[in-house]
Amino acid sequence: MPMEKLCFLSLAVLLWGCSTFEEEVLPDQADSPRQLSVSAAEEPGPDPGSLEIMRRAVDSVAAHSGVRSRSASVSGAQIEPTHRYMRFSPATKAQFDALFDQDEFTCYNFPLDEVSPVSADEGFRMSGPSDTPEQLYAVLRTTVVLPDTIVSEVLKELYDPSVTERGVADPAWADRVWAEARALIDDGRHPGKIIPYIPSGEIKVWDNIAGDYIPIEGVMVTIMPPDNLLRVLTTRTDKDGKFRMSGSVQEPVNYALSWNTVYWTIKSSAVSSANLRGPSVQGAWNVKISGDDVISGPATVFRAAYRYWHKMPALGLTAPNLGRKVRITCHNSVGFTYYWNGKELSASGLFHPVVNSDADPDIEVACKRNASYVFGTVAHEIGHAAHYAFNPKFNGKTNALIKESWAQFTRYILTETEYKDLGLYGKLHKSRLFNPNQHLVAFQVPDYYNQQMWYLGLGAERDETVRLYTPMFVDLYDTFNQNKWYGYWSPGRTKDDLDRTPDDDICMLTIREIQEIAFGSKNKSEAIGWIRQYAARYGFTSEEIDRYWAVYSLIEDEDYDRYK
């Protein structure tokens, strides 16, 4: 079998790390339904698009055409492959990433022509995280130039009669060739009347806040008839997690999902993709990804990434633009280790402003957590990426207090909007009723998600870790005064702790303005200067701004690095 090789050049860059602080470890979610399946592969039938079948089909069309027609002048010996079905064997994570970063073809971590006898309600099959680079499969045009470092093998040569080097050939002739090719391989595999159907389905994932499966919007779904590799259809799920292809098919198809887009890639390890392989079925594919499944992490990472890139810009957030796809690795663990200044450290989330090479992830996330925690962690790290990408040189001069407080704001605002849009806001936060002057008033209880439990503690450990992960920018947006809560509505903090709890009556209306303040400030002195200007536009007095800022002004050593 002919062999070809592929190589992609790598870029050398430097490593720098920033990890999130875990203020609260959320409890493990309750058991949720689990779907697994393992099945043996079957041999596919003949492919009508294979070069051998197509040459016979072209000759047959010519033999049954008028002597003066164009169809009669084209012989099978004249046609050359337009596509190749290939297997890649990357040897390093740099080579593996290069295949996923390019946009000329789509790679899958399973053979595209393999028939799986799994029923639609048995779920999906995937390889799972790997320590060695996976083999990848793809169908690509013969015009794609492949450098020669990644080993690749041509598994099948294909011909599409509707494609020429100059554009589209005669569509009537192409249709005749396709029909003849199908007739040549019709060996009785489909006895009786074949009823066309439209591939469709829905994709959902378990969420701990909902206590149920919720839809995932924007996921790319691919269908591939295993015996017709040139007929690949793709679509994306809608807001209800549903998908429906635009064309009908007759034969069973292979379904697949990809968490990758033109903006990001999501992997389950440095050298294994997180894509899902579905069953070979003749009908719909309805997927429910359970919370204890290894793929629930990448699914939740996708939810957060999709919201940041596709929903939040309309509300004022700027999505990160690194000049290439953002690479996200989802670790199947509650935490992961990394090295910084010669020390082994642990984290649940990490953004690398400058990566070591084109093989390293930009963002790492520990995904064996509750969905809401993973979602917030991803939102935090993408917030770091957006902050850095907006102005890398300025960001390099910005201290940790501003960076982490901004990332806490993106964690907050993405979580708020996600669960509001899902109709689950009442489950995200608890409320408590009070009865002042015989009028019931409902107050949202401070919690992990609204970040209103934060205060500048006096203990050394809390002061060195928690203090930089503040709700400084959250307090500019929300309508909650945590000082009044702990001092009046629900007393319980000591006077010292209450004095170090923000007294916040500021409420600015736009996310864009808060981003402008954060991205335009290198330290707290610059931040309060901008805050005074912006808050004054809304009529807030100097006294109100001073009360809001009093606790934040007490933060010292605002660029403290506890890892040195």
Where would I find each of the regions flagged by the language model?
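Pan-zinc metallopeptidase signature
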Residues: 42, 51-82, 90-100, 453-564
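Short, ordered, surface-exposed loop/turn motifs in non-cytosolic proteins
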Residues: 51, 61-64, 199, 204-228
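Short pre-active-site segment immediately N-terminal to the catalytic Zn-binding motif
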Residues: 362-378, 396-398
